[in-house]
């Protein structure tokens, strides 16, 4: 069991029961999954770029990502239906908690001019979305071996019914929200 899983069971659940008055510990919001997505627009012209993006995401997530393909042809983007244009992976259970621990304690403090994450990134249903502008903030990525700086989207899915519950859950994990 990872550090954040222990923290969730021993500290977060009792704190959220006390704050929101849940009658059952199973009613307390929990993390379901973390989805990482990296869109690589230049993959339409250069296949090597997508291979490097997949390798970077595999290092960051600890599992092999799937290659996403375009659903429709768009002439202005110069892509056709079925062409590979990005990669994504879904983290669950212990890998999810390990990634969140590294994100909170190692990667986000490495971001230049980091003053916290704005709390307006909730979707109204208890899920949180954020973006990272460069993949080199993760310690698994070697800065010298990177061919291009790429960002990625991080979607944290919870069982919370409201944004307030989800924010309280992430606050309990010491998520660095902006004041």
UniProtKB/Swiss-Prot annotation:
PROSITE patterns: RIBOSOMAL_L5. Transmembrane segments: none annotated. GO terms for biological process: translation. One of its GO terms (cellular component) is ribonucleoprotein complex. Keywords: Ribonucleoprotein, Ribosomal protein, RNA-binding, rRNA-binding, tRNA-binding. The keyword Ribonucleoprotein applies. Coiled coil: none annotated. It holds the Pfam family Ribosomal_L5. GO terms for molecular function: rRNA binding; structural constituent of ribosome; tRNA binding. InterPro entries: Ribosomal_uL5 (IPR002132), Ribosomal_uL5_bac-type (IPR020930), Ribosomal_uL5_C (IPR031309), Ribosomal_uL5_CS (IPR020929), Ribosomal_uL5_dom_sf (IPR022803), Ribosomal_uL5_N (IPR031310). Belongs to the universal ribosomal protein uL5 family. Part of the 50S ribosomal subunit; part of the 5S rRNA/L5/L18/L25 subcomplex. Contacts the 5S rRNA and the P site tRNA. Forms a bridge to the 30S subunit in the 70S ribosome. PANTHER family: 60S RIBOSOMAL PROTEIN L11-RELATED. This is one of the proteins that bind and probably mediate the attachment of the 5S RNA into the large ribosomal subunit, where it forms part of the central protuberance. In the 70S ribosome it contacts protein S13 of the 30S subunit (bridge B1b), connecting the 2 subunits; this bridge is implicated in subunit movement. Contacts the P site tRNA; the 5S rRNA and some of its associated proteins might help stabilize positioning of ribosome-bound tRNAs. This is Large ribosomal subunit protein uL5. It comes from Xylella fastidiosa (strain M12).
């Amino acid at each position: 069991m990872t550090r954040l899983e222990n923290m969730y069971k021993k500290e977060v659940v009792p704190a959220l029961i006390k704050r929101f008055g849940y009658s059952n510990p199973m009613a307390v919001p929990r993390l379901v999954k973390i989805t990482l997505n990296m869109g690589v627009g230049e993959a339409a012209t250069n296949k090597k770029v997508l291979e490097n993006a997949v390798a970077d995401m595999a290092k960051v997530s600890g599992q092999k990502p799937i290659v996403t393909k375009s659903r429709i042809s768009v002439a202005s983007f110069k892509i056709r239906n079925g062409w590979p244009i990005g990669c994504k992976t879904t983290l669950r259970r212990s890998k999810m908690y390990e990634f969140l621990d590294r994100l909170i304690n190692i990667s986000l403090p490495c971001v230049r001019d980091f003053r916290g994450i704005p709390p307006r990134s909730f979707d109204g249903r208890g899920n949180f979305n954020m973006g990272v502008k460069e993949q080199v903030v993760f310690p698994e990525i070697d800065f010298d071996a990177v061919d291009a700086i790429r960002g990625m989207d991080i979607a944290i899915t919870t069982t919370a019914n409201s944004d307030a519950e989800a924010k309280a859950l992430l606050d309990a994990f010491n998520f660095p929200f902006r004041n």
